[in-house]
């Protein structure tokens, strides 16, 4: 996943004291595992600046050695003056192969406690469930309005002046300020920096009302009604941000957008032009607040209406 790439982690290096680790086996020079992490006082967190962290291993990782590895990590952290570890485990949909040896080690070696459980909604692309009535009704409204969708190409000469990005970011910010009295985790400038570093992995998809000819003969610009920022991380397409304007919400803009994404952009693999395309899952992201204690029922209803079902994002803690 590109989230563990230095080009992504370092965009907010001023906010986190890096404590990431490269792990090699004794007597072997090959890299065995990675652990993105930062330190805050006497606490290690993997990772506070990411949706998830956790141990990243290859096919050589086996249960007994991963248990031994956590024993050595704990000893190393104690020697560094660390007294607490916060571990945001990688959800299983991001694994290229089964790799939950770390979770076993957390309970058996670290005696960790599950402190946060949040729920996301994910679609298995090759086995989609039926779309709900609400999404179907929204799609009919959008088609009646003749709405269109497009994937925004990265234009380095535009950067923060890209009209599609600016329009979407205003919609997103307005929604967050109005509903949650907060702002996006990223600024538009930060997001465009990341898009420039990972143009194939971070994409913006928008739904819009096409330009129309006015009575005086002039043409109005396309009106952006909603969109989503997509993170393409190996086999998972993850929606990092989703937003629609009040007008977009009233005319089914997001219903149109996700219908287009799931059926035209990321169809079942047997329908794809590039057969080796690895994408397996479409993840709508979490629908919880307050460390998982509050479930946003209207938000998860919309995601489940497209056939999304639960994948948990878990956080563990233990004392040293």
Short names for language-model regions:
Residues 1-28, 32-43, 90-248:
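A conserved beta-strand-loop-helix scaffold within acyl/acetyltransferase catalytic domains
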Residues 16-18, 79-82, 270, 277-279:
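Short, high-confidence coil segments that cap the C-terminus of an alpha-helix
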Residues 22-24, 34-35, 68-72, 201-320:
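Aromatic (often tryptophan-rich) hydrophobic motifs at membrane interfaces
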Residues 48-50, 116, 311:
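Short, solvent-exposed loop/turn segments at the edges of secondary structure
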Residues 48-96:
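A gly/proline- and charged-residue-enriched helix-loop-helix capping module
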Residues 87, 168, 303:
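A residue-level signal for conserved active-site and pocket-lining positions in enzyme catalytic cores
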